[in-house]
């Protein structure tokens, strides 16, 4: 059957329309998205006086995190176990007055990135040049996070990598590079997800706390047993050790955990240190997964765990992170702890521990005002 010119033209237009439809849809969708972005920016500007814009690609920060690939025996729970390790820390490592960015990777053979601030709104990855890129080698574990502290008081921030594996300490060579000094007294293996620098004894030198998650005898790439998970969802106490290292002042550290009263094996995910009682001695707070948080009070001689007596350590939660701040303008720190939540399963909510009225110093007590404060 012959088609006339009009039919052929209509058929051609139909096929052209089919070809153009996805493009038109994308353009319309893009315009709608742009309109929504502009609306959100305007509303944010009206409500808060500023708005945030995603500029990582323009700024040269193109990092893609690679998660850990662990022993195949964990295949059934791999998404849960391998969900950790993406971290970012901000530091002016070269003391040029501009903040730089360090991000960690968590796959064997993957590289971390150190983005140096170029002073023009862009960043350049100098991790290879500085010696802190190739840190996730077979047999050494993978990065879970990074914290910075000037442990030798030379004015430059040094780098501690916490890992599921061997913790790595890098000395900052005055902003020109980093030297690995891991043999400074740190253990060969800690499955850690948190650490904090703080001068617990007031000698002017930064000491170090590292919180274990999985037990230190567990190698997640070569398991001798799959019985590695918490023994309770509320009061688990079969996790990794908590380590306190005293800075000896000669570039080395001594492990003093038990001597200083820190022996817990709860599953540490976050830690922070501050003088919560106003005694001049920094205390230590640990947010634990699968259980209660811990508050270690520093009396100047050793630590004692005071979570229950201060009102904090009685409610089991899945602590994810912790931060201090005087949000009530009391002249005393409140403690904010984030918790994991899953609708219908884990509706825990975050905690805001505020000092109770009439309590202070060594008699301080806390109450949870998270719900009241919204």
Where are these regions (language model features)?
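Acidic, glycine/proline-rich Ca2+-coordinating loop motifs
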Residues: 1-374
